[in-house]
Amino acid sequence: MFPVRHALLCKALGCYDCCIRCLGAVPYPSLVSTLLCFTGMALFCGCGHEALAHTEVLVETYFVRNIQDYVILASFIKYFQYVIYGLASFFFLYCILLLAEGFYTTSAVKQTFGEFRSTRCGRCLSLTFIIVTYVLAVIWLAVFAFTAIPSSSSLIWHRPATTSTSWTETTPSINQHGWICMDARQYGLLPWNAMPGKACGMTLASICKTKEFFVTYDLYIAAFAGAGIALLALFLYVVATTYNYAVLRFLGRKGLRC
C-alpha cells in the first residue's frame, strides 16, 4: 500500500518527522470503529450462541416431556448458531477491509506520501464501501431490534424467578404461591399442546435456583449490548468513509493531486 519512495522519504526527513507523518496517516475513526465492531460482534456471537444453548437445555429439562414438542425449537437454535458462525467470519473480514480502505483514503486526503494518491477506481471502491456499509447498518438495525425480543423476554422471566426465590426463603411452603408460573408456550418457544409447557410452585423455585437460568439472563443482555456496539461501529464507519470520499471528490474537482 505504501510507495517505494517511503523509505527514502523517511531517510531524508529523519525518524521523528517520519513517525509524525505516519501517525498522521492513521485513520483513527476507522480504527476505533474496527475495535468497536470486533468487541460488539464478539459479545453478540459468543454470548448469543451460549444463551441459545442454555435456553435449549432449560426448555428440554423443565418444560417438556415429549421430545417432539421442542424439535422445532432445537432445529431453530441449531440453524441460528450456524448463522452466528457466518456473521462472525464475515464481519471480521469486512472490518479488516474497511480499516485498509480507511488507511488508503486518509493517506490520500492528507497527501502524506508524495506518490500516494487516489484514482477514479479507488474513489469508486470507496463509494462501494459506503453503500455496502450503509446497507449493512440498516440490516443490523433490524437485527438489533430482533435481539431486544429475547432480552426483554428474559427480563420478564427474571422477575417471577426473583419473586419465587425470595418467597421460598420466607415462606414455609412454596406451594402456597402456586399461582406464580412461567409459561414457555406464550413466548413461542413451544407449541400450545406441549405438556407441561409451564413451571409453577416447587418446579419454578428449583429452576430459579439453577446457575443456568441466571447465566442465560446475563448472556441475552450481553448479546443485546454487543449488537448495539456493532451497530454504533457501522454508523461510525459510514460517517468516516463518507467524509473521506467527500474530501477526495472536492479535491479532485479543484484539480489538486489527491
Curated annotation (Swiss-Prot):
Its main location: membrane. InterPro entries: Myelin_PLP, Myelin_PLP_CS. Central nervous system. Highest levels in spinal cord and medulla oblongata. It is a multi-pass membrane protein. Keywords: Cell membrane, Disulfide bond, Lipoprotein, Membrane, Palmitate, Transmembrane, Transmembrane helix. It is found in: Cell membrane. It comes from Oncorhynchus mykiss (Rainbow trout). One of its GO terms (biological process) is axon development. One of its GO terms (molecular function) is structural constituent of myelin sheath. Belongs to the myelin proteolipid protein family. This is the major myelin protein from the central nervous system. It plays an important role in the formation or maintenance of the multilamellar structure of myelin. May be involved in neuron and glial cell differentiation. GO terms for cellular component: myelin sheath; plasma membrane. Residues 1-22, 104-128, 240-258 are cytoplasmic. The chain crosses the membrane at residues 23-48, 83-103, 129-149, 219-239. Residues 49-82, 150-218 are extracellular. Disulfide bonds join 181-200. It comes from the Eukaryota. This is Myelin proteolipid protein.
